[in-house]
Regions:
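A generic, well-ordered mixed alpha/beta core segment in the N-terminal half of proteins
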Residues: 71-79, 83
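Helical "lid/coupling" subdomains associated with nucleotide-phosphate turnover
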Residues: 1-11, 15, 19-69, 84-180
Length: 180
């Protein structure tokens, strides 16, 4: 478990966060208490914007200070986090309720989805992302765009990137043209 790993590696603190699913659950507080009772780990519920900022910080540390302006995307099940910056903390970090699971449930009532459903979803996502994109791009063009989620890992794999089993230090790239 993450707790055992932290103990074995002499971590001074274990910081565990609960994201979109807990933020929106009617019984979120009960779930947090249950996890603490069963595991001894205290989860902290964080806002979507905090989630975006924490993810940005991890990306910045991984990519290094010389990476220039980073634009980070993180698609979860319930939310989509965006962040950008040139330093340890982001210039902007925000979250919108556009997670993959949420959108699938709300827009697709058949599998595979019909062209009409897909078109409706695309229109909706573009409308929701437009103000976010304007705010992020106001800080300047990114030197690097990073995707940090299983959704992006799966897309990169489909586009020919190395599999997850190749390890974390294998460079994986995906280009816009790969997605067309």
């Amino acid at each position: 478990s993450a707790r055992d790993f932290a103990i074995e590696n002499n971590a001074e603190d274990l910081l565990a966060f609960a994201t979109s699913a807990i933020r929106e659950a009617g019984n979120g507080a009960e779930v947090l208490q249950h996890v603490r009772r069963k595991t001894g780990v205290s989860l902290s519920g964080i806002s979507g914007d905090q989630e975006a900022a924490i993810t940005y910080f991890a990306v910045r540390r991984w990519q290094g200070w010389g990476a220039g302006r980073i634009l980070n995307f993180d698609i979860g099940g319930g939310s989509f986090e965006f962040s950008t910056g040139t330093d340890a903390l982001p210039d902007a970090a925000m979250s919108v309720p556009l997670g993959a699971g949420r959108l699938t449930r709300e827009f697709f009532d058949e599998q595979p989805p019909s062209p009409k459903q897909t078109k409706r979803l695309r229109r909706y996502v573009r409308e929701q992302i437009e103000p976010v994109a304007q705010r992020l791009l106001a800080f300047g063009e990114p030197n690097m765009v990073v995707g940090t989620s299983k959704t992006f890992r799966s897309l990169a794999r489909i586009c020919g990137a190395a599999p997850y089993s190749a390890g974390p230090h294998v460079k994986r790239e995906m280009h816009v043209t790969d997605l067309r």
